[in-house]
Structures are given as structure tokens and as C-alpha cells.
Amino acid sequence: MSQAYSSSQRVSSYRRTFGGAPGFPLGSPLSSPVFPRAGFGSKGSSSSVTSRVYQVSRTSGGAGGLGSLRASRLGTTRTPSSYGAGELLDFSLADAVNQEFLTTRTNEKVELQELNDRFANYIEKVRFLEQQNAALAAEVNRLKGREPTRVAELYEEELRELRRQVEVLTNQRARVDVERDNLLDDLQRLKAKLQEEIQLKEEAENNLAAFRADVDAATLARIDLERRIESLNEEIAFLKKVHEEEIRELQAQLQEQQVQVEMDMSKPDLTAALRDIRAQYETIAAKNISEAEEWYKSKVSDLTQAANKNNDALRQAKQEMMEYRHQIQSYTCEIDALKGTNDSLMRQMRELEDRFASEASGYQDNIARLEEEIRHLKDEMARHLREYQDLLNVKMALDVEIATYRKLLEGEESRINLPIQTYSALNFRETSPEQRGSEVHTKKTVMIKTIETRDGEVVSEATQQQHEVL
């Protein structure tokens, strides 16, 4: 072959390592292509075939750059070969290079297909997560917009109903308390009146006892006077008898004296003396009888008047006592009726208090249950918000990872689509491993998103980015 064969072949292999964290920088090494270069002399000349192997790495100096290609010479092999006119060329090295190139291209196709499959699966997963995220966001918005409002309306409505019932029960209790106070006032007034009536009864009984003592004293005085009257009557009768006896004796004496006068006419003054004595005795007896009768009549009249007065007072006291007894009986019946009414009202009040306490406890249980439901809904909302925040973080991480993969794919596509002449025209500069290690750097971006919630509602949301150069 008279024309020198000089071409640049590109041998590259895609070796990527995907980690679990989504924020891998773009500056990680992606491939290590090997660039063989063979030089063939012309016919009739002696030349050497030189092949150099370069290690190319992609580094990123920023967040979105495609990177730069760096090549370092690993070794040089020289194979002497002389071609003359009419001599057979040795294509063993070219065949080996072509075979290696075909193998590398086949491996690259397989790896590209696997990467495409993985990327398609990853995109499907991202779409699924986005759908889940949208569904969760819609559910969060629905819960945020409807459920708390409905629960709040139900809670407020039930609370208003409970307050209305409490007001009704409070009014009923106030009315019952007023009635009870009125009944207690009536009872106190009746008790005071009863005490007054009891005092009046005691005074009447004391007066009656005093009147009884007076009546007894009057009765005793009357009996004494009756006895004295009887004794006086007996004395009068006795005096009458004595007077009659004396009169009879005097008459007998007078008769004897008359006989003696008749017989003896010498005593004419005796009859006159007897007549004077009889007259004196009759006058004295009549005076005594009249005085005794007047005294007896006056005493009997006084005793009769006192007895009548005492009988009238006793009858009046008995009548008042009967009236007091009737009043006491009526007051006792009224007090018993008021006691029964008070007992029934107290029983109704206790029943109302028990029912009010049971209803209040039931309302408190309902309020506690509603508050527990509200707290549970708030916890559910907070949990959904946390899940939503986690999904947002995952989405952001996935977006960053997708952008990273997109930039990687764009860089690889731009690198693959470059013509071979571009790679042959590259000015590879040889660097040492120490210089490569000092020049290779990566940039790591960490995004921190802070969402503050209060009572299940988003209060504030802040995003912070931190850049680290590795």
C-alpha cells in the first residue's frame, strides 16, 4: 500500500456508578476512553508505528458545564515496520485494533441499551411518583379546604345547640329556684305565724289556767258562802227556835204572870215591861234577820256576778281555744300541704339537676369526642403535610437527579455525535497523576426546604441552597 495509513480511532467505555443519593455532582468520572494512534510510512521508506493510550476524564468546574476533556499519556509502544514497494503489509495490529474497537462498540451499545432501559424505568417511576404527589396534593387541598370547615361547622352547630339547651336548663333552674325561694318565704312566714299562734295559744291556756284558778277560788268562796249561809240559816233557825222558846217561855211566864196578876192585882207594871222586852227582842230579831238577809243577798249577788263573769270568761276562753285549735289544724294542714309541695319541688329539682348533670356529662363527652376527632384530623392533616413535604423533597431530589442525568446524557450525546476528526484535532496535553488529582474538583449542591406548619396549616416555607466544592 503506497499511501501511508494514519487514522485516529476512539475506543471508549461507559462506566457509570449510580448511588442512592440524588444529588451526585456532575464532575464524577464518566468514562476512560482509549485513543490508539498508528502511523504508517509510505512505500520505500522505513517508519515506526507508534500507539499512545490516553485516559480521558470529565470534570466539572461548575454546576451545569459539560466539562473538559483531559488526556494523559499512559505509555508508548513502537513497532518497527518497513514497507517497500511490492511488499506485503502486516495488518495484524490493525485487525487487533479493529477487533477491540468492535468489541468496545458492542459493549457500549449493550451498556447504552441497559442505561436507556434504566432511564426509562426511572422516568416511569418519576411519573408515578408525580401522579402520587399530585393525588396527595389534591387530597391535602381537599382536606384543607373542606373537612376542617365541615367539622368546624358541625362543632359550632352542636356547640350552639348545647349552649341553647344549657340556657334553657339554666332558665328552668332559675325559675325553680325562684319558686323554691318563694315557697321557703311562705313557709318561713307560716312558721312565724304558727309560732305567734302557739304563743297566743299558750297565753290563752295561761289565762284559762288563771281563770280556772279564779273559778276554783270563786267556787270555793261560793261553797264557803253557801256553807256560811247554811250555818247562818241554821243559826237563824236555831235563833228562831230559841226566840220562839223564849217567846213561849215568856208567854208562859206572861200567862203565869197574868194569872198571878189576875190573882194578885198588886203587880200592874210587869205586863208592860214584858211587852217592852218583847218589842225590843222582836225589833232586834227583825233587824238581825233583815241584816242577815241583806248580807246574804249581797254576797249571793256578788258571787253570782263573779260566777257569771267567770263563766263568760271561761266560755270566751273556750271559744277562743276552739278557734285557735281550728286555726292550728288549718295551719297544720296547710304546712303539711306546703311540705308535700316543697318535697315534690325538691324532688323535681333533684331530678332536673341529675338530668342536667347527665346531659352536661353527655355534652362534655360529645365535646371531648369532637375535640378528639378534630385533633385526629389535625394529626392526619399534619401527617399528610409531612408526607407531602417528604414527597416534595423527593420530587426536588428527583428533579435534581433528572437534571443531572439529562446533562449527563446531553454531554454523552454531544461527545458521541462529534466526528472522529474532532477528536483527532484535539490538542491533548500530557499531565501527571499529581496534576490531575489537583485539578479535578466537584461541586455539591444541597437544597434545604423548610416548611413550618401550625394546627395543620402551612405557615411559612423557605428554601436554602448550600454549595460545597469537593
From Swiss-Prot:
Coiled coil: none annotated. InterPro entries: IF_conserved, IF_rod_dom, Intermed_filament_DNA-bd, Intermediate_filament. The modification Asymmetric dimethylarginine is found at R37. Residues 2-108 are annotated as: Head. The modification Phosphoserine is found at S7, S12, S28, S31, S32, S45, S60, S68, S81, S290, S358, S361, S424. GO terms for cellular component: cardiac myofibril; cell tip; cell-cell junction; cytosol; extracellular exosome; fascia adherens; intercalated disc; intermediate filament. Residues 413-470 are annotated as: Tail. Residues 142-151 are annotated as: Linker 1. The modification ADP-ribosylarginine is found at R58. Muscle-specific type III intermediate filament essential for proper muscular structure and function. Plays a crucial role in maintaining the structure of sarcomeres, inter-connecting the Z-disks and forming the myofibrils, linking them not only to the sarcolemmal cytoskeleton, but also to the nucleus and mitochondria, thus providing strength for the muscle fiber during activity. In adult striated muscle they form a fibrous network connecting myofibrils to each other and to the plasma membrane from the periphery of the Z-line structures. It is linked to Myopathy, myofibrillar, 1: A form of myofibrillar myopathy, a group of chronic neuromuscular disorders characterized at ultrastructural level by disintegration of the sarcomeric Z disk and myofibrils, and replacement of the normal myofibrillar markings by small dense granules, or larger hyaline masses, or amorphous material. MFM1 is characterized by skeletal muscle weakness associated with cardiac conduction blocks, arrhythmias, restrictive heart failure, and accumulation of desmin-reactive deposits in cardiac and skeletal muscle cells. GO terms for biological process: cytoskeleton organization; intermediate filament organization; muscle contraction; nuclear envelope organization; regulation of heart contraction; skeletal muscle organ development. Keywords: ADP-ribosylation, Cardiomyopathy, Cell membrane, Coiled coil, Cytoplasm, Desmin-related myopathy, Disease variant, Intermediate filament, Limb-girdle muscular dystrophy, Membrane, Methylation, Muscle protein, Myofibrillar myopathy, Nucleus, Phosphoprotein, Ubl conjugation. Residues 253-268 are annotated as: Linker 12. Pfam families: Filament (PF00038), Filament_head (PF04732). Changing N342D: In MFM1; unable to form a filamentous network; abolishes binding to MTM1. Changing H326R: In CMD1I; uncertain significance; does not affect filaments formation. Residues 152-252 are annotated as: Coil 1B. The gene is DES. This is Desmin. Residues 268-415 are annotated as: Interaction with NEB. Changing R454W: In MFM1; reveals a severe disturbance of filament-formation competence and filament-filament interactions; increased interaction with CRYAB. Changing A120 to K/L/V: Does not result in impaired filaments formation.
